[in-house]
Amino acid sequence: MITATVRYKLPPHIDYTACREHFHKIAPGFRQVSGLLSKHFIWSESGWAGGVYQWETLEDAKAFYSGPWLDGIVERYGMRPSIEFYEVFALTDNARGTVELFKEPVLG
């Protein structure tokens, strides 16, 4: 499993309310993204926003971030996002009452 963090600076005309409304509008569309397990839409008072994504594979993540999604981010926010990838070693899910250990290396 891969976790990716994506961040971009919001332009001045996109405030908290506009960002929240946009995220609410686009969230259902991520149900169809191949290899995406989950996405958290995030916002900070510092004026940065983005997402924390859980992916099945690094290949799925890289394919998504290099496609039309990237063009949309650059067009909407006026900058290329910062994207970092992390290998997940273990996942504690308190909502489901589970702990999952990932023993096969993904990145290293």
Describe each region flagged by the PLM:
Residues 1-48, 58-66, 77-108:
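Short S/T/G/P-rich N-terminal loop/turn motif that feeds into the first structured element of a domain
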Residues 51-55:
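Conserved RNP beta-strands of RNA recognition motif
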Residues 71-75:
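A common structural junction motif
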